């Protein structure tokens, strides 16, 4: 089988079976490593056979309990049918932001038990579902905003909670069987025609 390793600093920090097929990581204030797994990545039409999670992909928390620089434990924070190969994660306070086209999801742990008490779709409408050209990394910016990147597997038609709508497409057509028909020339609320990959800024309220 395939063994996945994670290196932080000068040596090997963790390896399978603490996690499988990591697509993105973040580190919280307790120095724990949060891993967004993409085990179920592109398994349609017999592609990528092997391990599969029927209940959806996972976010796991990997910990070095004794401070020796090597992780000993992991726990599942969330496993969700809406998670199909998530490609980005940001842990900000008690909120965990996960990029997984068509959604940017927010899981909130209100009681500190390392399990989500609520789930919110902060933004939706990104193309590239189950595709590596979809919604990618999400990070907290120094301005207090959320910054994230999306690839060219559109179309992306995303309406923020203040009504502003991003519309972006391109000539790229290899979006897989779950993709909508991509098209260039879409005009956003700002009057601009955005195309290809994008870097976007939003906020924790979905505006």
Label the predicted regions:
Residues 1-207:
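Beta-propeller blade termini and top-face loops
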